[in-house]
């Protein structure tokens, strides 16, 4: 399973440091041992008790009380913005009754020891300080933060599930120690979308309880209406395990909502989308609601010649996109700016004037990928004091993603 974290030492370190993670028993709330914090309000910085230099943003839902136990989601942003996911999803936390914690320190580029200490400090906060249900501790992340969340879920234990947005698992030769419930979310314009599609197949083979959500969007924290699927997923998984009572009304509402979406897929003739939505519907409600009718519909789609044709087209595009990404890497410093202007203009013309929606989304992903490649290349050569290469990388960055390029220059004082 491909990723950017490759050292087995990282896995061993996390396993050792977090081997004493939260247990799997449930007890009654004890207000005497719970830190009083204002509910229904985001607290931007709460200092960890174990390491005072480490902090997190906190949100207690409006219905929070120390007399009850609440599920918690610990969020990891790639830029260390603990408050960002809390601001986006606090209404969902209120609706479903979740505590939200967002790391202020975990971010891309940290060494293994620092990341391990941060994670250890955060998880120590889930015991004793707030009224948390130890059977329902979840980790969530976006981009590099999704890889951190997955690493915790796969190797720590004590986490019921992982919500991975915009990136998949870290790469490792080590076998997973745990199989948490897992849901991935990616936009059609996300350069990591194909990675998550492939990961979904691998999780099927590995017998994970999992689901995968695709939406029309870019490489970013998902919109609230998309993220709500993840909250529903964690609720349904908890119902299956008997952690919370079965909520028939919630289940039926979800089924009806998905049936409407599937109906629209049929109207537009998008059988790949229809297939994906049927698969997810079955995964969500399996063990909670009859799935026989949905499985029959899925079989009908899979046996149709038009679906097979659309699926073959999709696989061809994925192969083409992988080759194009490699070409962008290979040509990054060897081609001049005029060549890059023509390349990027070609993507933009296909996006604005193209009639093949699959090609349009592919070009959006390639532009997004080139933006990331430019950013990473710029930082790498700048740290080596290669000013000419840095100038070249920034010029490409300014063409493909001018807004983020300006922000990067401002951050660097350039």
Indicate residue ranges for each PLM-predicted region.
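Extended non-globular C-terminal regions
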Residues: 286-414
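Short beta-strand/loop motif that positions the catalytic acidic residue
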Residues: 183-187
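C-terminal catalytic histidine-bearing segment of alpha/beta-hydrolase fold enzymes
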Residues: 204-282, 288, 293-303, 308
